[in-house]
Amino acid sequence: GERVSGHIQILDVIIEKLSEPDRTCSCLLVYNDIAANYIIDGLKEKGISIPEDIAIASFDNTLLAQTKKITSVAQPVNEIAHLAFQMVKHQQQPDSIEMHEIVSRLIIRESSVKINITSL
């Protein structure tokens, strides 16, 4: 619908800005793997090399990121869901805030660094 169309338009604006010869951005951190893949495809169509001209990373570490070799932050979704459920279930005082640290992992792939397998 309209929301998806507007979303695509914003990604297209990002692609146009990053395609300008005077860009100063060397790395882009995108909010999810699907949007990162769209941006990578759009930049490649404009002759921008990934990661030589601009590095791209995203969030979620989905199968798309794994297949397309997109650097991605892997978030422990099951742990987050379980913790959220427990917090709601055991919430005693509505005004109290309990802090929890959740560890994510950065999975480095070819969208952010050129990997030479023979030199490993």
Q: For each predicted feature, which ranges?
A:
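Short beta->alpha junction loops
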Residues: G1-Q9
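Flexible loop/turn connectors
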Residues: I8, D12-L120
